[in-house]
Amino acid sequence: AIFEAQLGDDVFQEDNSVNLLETKAAKLSGKEGALLVPSGTMGNLVSFLVHCPRGTEAILGNKSHTFSYEAGGISAFGGIHSHQLHNEEDGTIEIQSIKNAIRHDNIHFPKTALISLENTHNKCFGYPLSKDYLDSVADIAQENNLKLHIDGARIFNATVALDISLSTLVENVDSVTFCLSKGL
């Protein structure tokens, strides 16, 4: 079977398997496009790099995977400052805390560019973040000219728990990562 497998360079969109997977992921998420990367950590890093110019900051939970387990990649590779806020037991960050943490043009601080949430939240007992909560945070992001990213390594667990499609759950977020080795 390996001798009959179709081969191609995915850089030139010649790998049919990758093309089909990316097309399916874009359709499932309701997003314009999708990109296959080797790990969720890399997916998060790519998303942060797209949304955050060097020297800006991202608001994320103090128990988030990106902050806790991704080796400081956003700082090391992107020059992105992480502004950690307290994660509640259910994985949320208090709405008012998010609003209060946003920093605009002030020479003393990095400018906020991104809010990142995790759904479901690994270190917060796997609770799913509701559509209403995501939409509330998306509203804050839009009102402040920020982007909203979802680390969705386990997002399919959230869709099952909430009985909602992925595209509906993330329709108001700017980017979402998901892992093909978890929750399928």
PLM segments and residue spans:
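Conserved PLP-enzyme active-site core in the AAT-like
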Residues: 1-5, 11-184
